[in-house]
Amino acid sequence: MKLALIAGCVAGRRACRLLSEALHRCGSTVTLIGPAPDEAAAEPDWLPLPLPQLAASELLDHVDAVGVFLDGESLRQFRRIHGQAAALRGRSPRPLFSGPFRPLYGDALAADLLPRLGVDLLCLQGEAQLAELNWLVQGTPQAQQACEAIGLWCLPTAPIGHSISQEPLLVVLDQPEIPPSPFANGVLYERLCAVARASPHWQVRLQCDQPLPPDPQQWPQTSLGWHHLQSSRPPANLQLGDHADPLPGLIQARVCMGIGSDWLLPPMVWGKPTVVLGDYGIRTAFNGPLFFGSGVMRRLMDCLPLDALLNSSRPDPTWLAWRGWSIVDGPQRLLRRLEALIG
Amino acid sequence: MTLKLLLVADSDSQLLACQALADAVRALGGAVTVNAIPKPGTPAGVLGALERSGPLWAMSTTRLLADPRLEGFDAIGVYLTGSKLAEFRSTYRLSRQRQRQPLRPLFCGFNGVVLERFEEAIAWRLGYDLICLNGPRDQARLDLLLRHTPFQAQRSVITGLARNRPAPASSKARERILVFAEQVVMPAAPHERRRLVQMLARLARRSPDWQVLIKPRVAAHETTFHAVDTHISATLREALGSPPANLQLSYEPLPQLLQRSRLLATVSSTALFDALDFGCRPVVVADFGLRQDLGTPFFAASGLLRSLDASEDLDALEQGSDADPAWLHWVGYHPEFSAANLLRALTDLAGGVHDSAPLQLSHPGYVVNAADLSTNQLRRGAEAAIRCRDYDEAARLLEIAQLHRPDNRNIGRRLAAVRQRNRLLRRLALLVTPGLRA
């Protein structure tokens, strides 16, 4: 099957690359297409095309189906132009599939799904998202929306080898906008310094969960990394991770920790001890509802000594399965549904 | 058995919810007292209506919990914002234990349709003996949230969205009035609020035989849950300059307006259900699309979505379809769901039909907002720990409180005091730093 996957933002591109690799292993040919974000971020495996031209492009006539993993307004624009261009050419629009490319839940999932309703196939992650979709569209004209759960496709959850660091390493996921004030971030940074000082035989690494500019001067003041650079005497065992990619750090970590980052899910799937910081409670803006049922929420001060985390803090497997972990044949499921769609 | 209920609320929308619940319970033979916690800016009209309909108290939470008359009630309904809800539950239990008084069932609910942050709201409400929900839609979402968690035993009851007694059929013809129920943050963006009033003005110009009345959520000097910079009257001036003569603001109470008007339009207000109660035809403004931030997805299956801009005039808008009965049932507007369900559930609780042990909120690996996570609860806990000379526990609680409120200097000072290792200096520091005022 020949497929095109379209994405715009960093998370969408990463997710599409993962899906493309999985589909390729199933024998499909996949072309990655998307507007080039900027010169520096140009990626060789992406076909750079501006969105309006891409939506109207005859290139899409040569694929069996198109996966559109754009955000709300871009997605609306793509669907409108693609439909109009196909009508002008006297052809049917290509079968479109789409879905959230982050592990969303609650209000965030509903907001993400609304502009996607009406596509030929909605790709969701697990039973939890299917149940939420049914709840959202109950009684509406979209109640019969075609959908398929294809697992946690958007995150690198494939098994990893034994590449953990020799020295115990705690990776703290730094979400540059959470908490949303520089002062609150400063307080959290001080707390993490205290954790590092109380655990001298551990390395504590602040790992940004999304790419930050190479120049630290441009880092947001609401990131832990920014506070670390301002600190005059940070603990010797507190360090910064790779500003561009959280994956290597997570692979090396013995324990992972964060407030509500999507990147907490891969270590959970890999079976690493993971802590969701519960100090802020269940707040929608902090992605709390997603992790409410995870079974690994605890307060920062209850994480000491860090050694105690090594034998605990595993997520509830039923919760993880409900989020999509139990689906191991996601790409095959997707291809089966697309084949049925194309007829 | 006549149930005696106490309802506790503070802000205007919660007081309105209490008013509706009190009326319904009284109509079913129950006795209700409302305690309106004093709060600046609470609309006098809301308090006046409460006073006219039954006993109204105006005590702070502290005074209320010390009042011996509390023992005379069979159950207490609490209609406060999230953190205050959790704090009330916690302090009520503590005060009963201290006074060696039996615990009465506590219940809470929502003051209208829940358009966003439902999970967060539930995380504050867990632990109440009963959570009142609007309809099967909210029940389904609660079940989704609690599935695979230790909180599945949380009790809830569906009490519906009907807030007014059905209006008796009037022989008097309704006036050609469209009431627009304004919401202060839906939409929130100033340019969208201007667009909204411009749409209403165009519709008024196309319908010279009609009157379009914008019903502001609150008057300019009053407050509601959401703080806003620009009152709708200012938006009207900014967007229109001189509005058409048949477009006006109206501060007449909504029930009165709805009893004489033909149409109600709203973006996503609970007033839609008030309109149904009073026999006024509602429409949902579809011009902004289905957007989570506007709460419009709630109405997607209602059959009431209409574009104001695409409507020829108000006569045409009035000819639309009725609300879909299946949707009305799904969201809770159905005779099956009423305050009678609450009274039945409370009677069952009192009769020991169900296990009445409070829901255990502390489980390893789970954090709920309701479990002593409001800043004041944390500070109160810290002060209790200081009195017991457990300074490590006090520091732990103050550290969490500081993460919640990093800008609160008193928390920071108190934390520095309990962290002081020198006994004498610590004692001195505790003397000069402010604890939590009762």
Identify the residue ranges that each predicted region occupies.
Chain B
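Leloir-type glycosyltransferase catalytic cores
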Residues: 299-374, 380
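Hydrophobic/aromatic side-chain positions at a characteristic register within alpha-helices
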Residues: 374, 386-387
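Conserved catalytic-core segment of nucleotide-activated headgroup transferases in glycan assembly
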Residues: 17, 163-235
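Active-site and donor-binding regions of nucleotide-sugar-utilizing enzymes
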Residues: 6-28, 35-152, 158, 401-410, ...
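A donor-sugar binding/catalytic signature common to diverse glycosyltransferases
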Residues: 250-295
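Nucleotide-activated donor-binding/catalytic signature segment of Leloir-type glycosyltransferases, i.e.
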Residues: 229-251
